[in-house]
Curated annotation (Swiss-Prot):
Zinc found in the keyword field: no
PANTHER family, per database record: MAP/MICROTUBULE AFFINITY-REGULATING KINASE (PTHR24346), SPERM MOTILITY KINASE 3A (PTHR24346:SF95)
Annotated keywords: ATP-binding, Kinase, Nucleotide-binding, Serine/threonine-protein kinase, Transferase
Domain UBA: 294-334
Protein known as: Sperm motility kinase Y
Misc. remarks from the entry: Encoded on the T-complex, a region of 20-30 Mb on proximal third of mouse chromosome 17. Naturally occurring variant forms of the T-complex, known as complete t-haplotypes, are found in wild mouse populations. The t-haplotypes contain at least four nonoverlapping inversions that suppress recombination with the wild-type chromosome, and lock into strong linkage disequilibrium loci affecting normal transmission of the chromosome, male gametogenesis and embryonic development.
EC number: 2.7.11.1
All residue ranges annotated as the Protein kinase domain in the record: 28-276
Family statement: Belongs to the protein kinase superfamily. CAMK Ser/Thr protein kinase family. Smok subfamily.
Naturally occurring in which organism (per UniProt): Mus musculus
Gene Ontology molecular function: ATP binding; protein serine kinase activity; protein serine/threonine kinase activity
Catalytic activity field: L-seryl-[protein] + ATP = O-phospho-L-seryl-[protein] + ADP + H(+); L-threonyl-[protein] + ATP = O-phospho-L-threonyl-[protein] + ADP + H(+)
Highest rank taxon of the organism: Eukaryota
Length: 508
């Protein structure tokens, strides 16, 4: 990176090095840099209230990339789909713009296929269906991506995908043609090389055909380092037929990579193709109008408890402000959804009977936020590591909640299963557990436990054990409790086995 860029966008630190970063650091803890370009930088950060990791794109407003990035943000504000990366928050200062994005786990589809050689037809179908669902959703909103390629598709170890990078996307009305020619050459449709107006939805469908071919073969159908030669191949529309695949798949590939866009199918027609027929249940209905936002009352109550106003929360959501309140709401909503999914997958754990008096001081809930007159939803957390690192914003939140504890206050307890930095890709952190803790203090719990232990010793006509013995019991209690909590809330995901390394050689 050039030296002057490093000066303008300094490396992350626990405290803001620029006064304009105050708003960012008041809501997020900046961890480290994920990547950088000439005029922008992407940071890994954690949301102070929930502990959820996010990606922060920092842009310089006086640079050429700023306006395209804001255009991308305006398009992403209209999108909410499980197979598309989510935009959480947007704000600007005098010289910078900040895009808070969902942190996507996994690796690029390009790297996934490259490491495997190719993937089998059934797996390719499952991945392609997710891509098709996202593209059909966008086309239903009048949004064309224009840069669909394996590099812009992320896949995790469960086979779930998310489309990223809407930097070249645009919104059109039905029947509108585009004049701007952009995207990767190898995935560009023939009409892009003719330098004429084109239908953006049809060019997206061509790119889908190239992606599908790449998945089952392991290489792109049109390949040349010489641009004129690559252009000649694409305009001719002739490519090596894939080996070892069904006739239905071959037919779908030929339809998607039809040179004349007038005869190229739409997303709706692709879904009806025999290769996909019977597998499209559950895909997003592209003709369905967006459902009006109805905030979850449990989440609204929790946010009210820490000082937000219900009216402001609803206004932020309905008017799509993408501000601090809407970001907090969406992060809590995603945690609740993940918790529900994991609870359905987790096996039933029988209760463990301890040989010592049990504590009645609160029960952890993994599904819903419970609130009562004496309950506090600010639970203890293992992150952040020190109360001194909390910004004034978080401390004010705790004061509004009426909590004067020396412990760290997050809305949910963060999971300790943190990925190491030497992994090949950044995984999205495990969602924290939702807690409903009692207002009984730790001192009163400790006093009751010692009192109960004293009664047991007197009943057996034995002297009371030393404090060291009591502390050992307390440590044992905490270990058992942590083990039970881990079983209930932290079921790790299973990794899919590695695919074979054999490659399919295209027919000449």
């Amino acid at each position: 990176m050039p030296a002057h860029i490093e000066e303008e966008l300094p490396p992350p630190s626990p405290q803001p090095s620029n006064p304009e970063d105050g708003e960012l650091y008041s809501q997020y803890k900046v961890v480290r840099t994920l990547g950088h370009g000439t005029y922008a930088k992407v940071l890994l950060a954690k949301h102070w209230l929930t502990g959820t990791p996010v990606a922060v794109k920092v842009l310089l407003k006086n640079k050429p990339c700023f306006q395209p990035a804001m255009k991308e943000a305006n398009i992403m504000k209209k999108i909410k789909h499980p197979n598309i990366v989510s935009l959480l928050q947007v704000f600007e200062t005098k010289t910078r713009g900040y895009l808070i994005m969902e942190l996507v786990e996994g690796q690029e589809l390009y790297e996934y296929i490259k490491s495997s050689g190719h993937i089998e037809e059934d797996e390719a179908r499952q991945i392609f269906l997710q891509i098709l669902s996202a593209v059909s959703y966008c086309h239903g909103l009048g949004i064309v991506h224009r840069d669909l390629k394996p590099d812009n598709i992320m896949i995790d170890d469960k086979g779930s995908i998310k489309i990223i990078d809407f930097g070249l996307s645009t919104q059109v009305k039905p029947g509108d043609l585009l004049d701007e020619h952009c995207g990767a050459y190898a995935f560009g449709a023939p009409e892009l090389f003719l330098w004429k107006s084109y239908d953006g939805t049809k060019s997206d469908l061509w790119a889908l055909g190239v992606i599908l071919y790449y998945m089952v073969v392991g290489k792109v159908p049109f390949d040349s380092y010489i641009i004129p030669e690559l252009q000649r191949q694409i305009l001719a529309g002739v490519y090596p037929a894939p080996c070892g695949v069904s006739n239905e798949l071959k037919d779908l590939l030929s339809l998607l990579m039809t040179v004349n866009p007038k005869y190229r199918p739409t997303v709706t027609e692709v879904m009806k193709h025999p290769w996909l027929r019977g597998h499209c249940k559950g895909l997003t209905n592209i003709h369905e109008e967006p459902v009006p936002v109805r905030p979850d009352p449990d989440i609204v109550d929790a946010m009210q408890y820490i000082g937000f106003q219900a009216k402001d929360i609803r206004e932020s959501l309905t008017k799509e402000k993408f501000n601090e309140m809407s970001a907090a709401y969406y992060l809590l909503e995603e945690q609740a959804l993940q918790r529900e999914v994991r609870s359905t997958q987790a096996p039933t754990v029988s209760q463990v009977k301890a040989p010592f008096p049990s504590m009645d001081a609160g029960e952890a809930s993994c599904l819903k936020i419970k609130r009562s007159g004496s309950a506090s939803i600010l639970g203890r957390s293992v992150w952040p590591p020190s109360i001194d690192q909390e910004p004034a914003y978080v401390q004010k939140v705790r004061q509004r909640a009426g909590r004067r504890s020396s412990g760290h206050g997050l809305l949910f307890e963060a999971n300790q299963m943190t990925p190491t930095q030497d992994q090949h890709h950044i995984r999205a952190m495990s969602v924290p557990c939702m807690l409903s803790t009692s207002s009984i203090s730790e001192e009163s719990v400790s006093e009751k436990r010692e009192e109960n232990l004293s009664h047991i010793a007197l009943a057996e006509d034995k002297p009371i054990r030393s404090r060291g013995w009591c502390r050992g019991i307390m440590r044992w209690t905490r270990r058992v409790g942590n083990a039970i909590r881990t079983l209930c809330c932290c079921i790790p995901s299973r990794k899919t086995p590695q695919l074979g390394q054999s490659r399919v050689s295209p027919q000449k």
